[in-house]
Each structure stands twice: as C-alpha cells, then as structure tokens.
Curated annotation (Swiss-Prot):
With S4 and S12 plays an important role in translational accuracy. Located at the back of the 30S subunit body where it stabilizes the conformation of the head with respect to the body. The keyword rRNA-binding applies. Pfam families: Ribosomal_S5, Ribosomal_S5_C. NCBIfam families: rpsE_bact (TIGR01021). The gene is rpsE. Residues 20-83 form the S5 DRBM domain. GO terms for cellular component: small ribosomal subunit. GO terms for molecular function: rRNA binding; structural constituent of ribosome. This is Small ribosomal subunit protein uS5. The N-terminal domain interacts with the head of the 30S subunit; the C-terminal domain interacts with the body and contacts protein S4. The interaction surface between S4 and S5 is involved in control of translational fidelity.
Length: 186
C-alpha cells in the first residue's frame, strides 16, 4: 500500500516537473585540494522556466556531472520569479540589470525580431517564454554574473497597470501616451 502511494506521489511530481523547460548554461570542473592531492568535482548552472513568464536559476555542485545538474535544477525550481510579458512574447519596457562587474541591457522588440542575446541570457529568455528581445551584456562575461544580472533586470520589469497605479493615472491614459510616443518614432 505504501509503495502505491509513493508511486502516485512520484507520478504527480513528474507531471509538475514536465511543465518546466530546463537549460544547462554552464558546467565547470572544480578542484578541492586535500592532504592526498586534489579532489575533482563539477559545478553546474541551470535555468528553469515554464515558458509562460516564470523562470529561475540554480547552482549545483557534486562529484559527478548528472548529480550537479540535478541539484542545480532543483535549486532553480525552488527559487523562481514571475515576469510580466507583453502579449506573452516580449518585455513591457527597456530595463537594465547589474550584478558584480556584469551589466545587461534588455530592450523590448517588435514581433518577428527573435531573441538577440548572448549565451547565458539566451537560455534565460528561452525558458522564460520570451520570443522577441534585444539584449546586450557589458562588462563581465562570467556566466554566473550574466545570469544574475539578467534576473536583476527581469525583477525590475513591471506591468503597465502597476506603473499607472504608482503614478496615480489611468491605465488607458498610459497606453495612449505610449502609442503616441511609439507612433511618433516611426
């Protein structure tokens, strides 16, 4: 009886996990120096998302690569954030993020533009569900700093309704202003 319940729980966990897409961003061989020499292990950086606006990243370390990836994936699923997307495909506004010496600039893009971003940032956008974005990384090219800077930028992403509420104006007024500005640029 207990075995059946355990199997049911595992199936439920697998169904929940199947909704997520995970991408391995970086794997690194690390060494711990001990009295007898060096002990080698692996560190993995993984990004996990549901391609509907939820995304997280995790770091895992272990003696074997698959175990490091599993730990990183579990850490990423525990620490996810929600990012509001415009039309489910791009960002609402341009934003900048920083972490350490890494700095990233994220710009909303028109439909059909695609994901124009370098390595670690591309993995974040693909798992997030963004289809059109232009991103530029400045400073550090360390994958850990780039991913953390990207998450810093995404945390500052706000829905226009929230911006309108902060400013004390109607959402429709904000949208009208946005269309006036976008229309004058073309």
């Amino acid at each position: 009886m207990a075995q059946r319940e355990r199997n049911r729980e595992e199936r439920g966990r697998e169904e929940r996990d199947s909704e997520f897409v995970d991408k391995l961003v970086h794997i690194n061989r690390v060494a711990k120096v001990v009295k007898g020499g060096r002990r080698f292990g692996f560190a993995a950086l993984v990004v996990v998302g549901d391609q509907k606006g939820r995304v997280g990243f995790g770091h895992g370390k272990a003696r074997e690569v698959p175990e490091a990836i599993r730990k990183a994936t579990e850490a990423a699923k525990r620490d996810m954030i929600f990012v509001p997307l415009r039309s489910g495909r791009t960002l609402h506004h341009d934003v900048e993020g920083r972490h350490g010496a890494g700095k990233v600039l994220l710009r909303a893009a028109p439909a059909g533009k695609g994901i124009i971003a370098g390595g670690p940032m591309r993995a974040v956008f693909e798992t997030l569900g963004v289809q059109d974005v232009v991103a530029k990384s400045l400073g550090s090219s360390n994958p850990y700093n780039m991913v953390r800077a990207t998450f810093d930028a995404l945390k500052h992403q706000m829905h226009p309704k929230d911006i309108a509420a902060q400013r004390g104006i109607k959402y429709s007024t904000l949208q009208a202003r946005r269309h006036d500005v976008v229309g004058s640029e073309e």
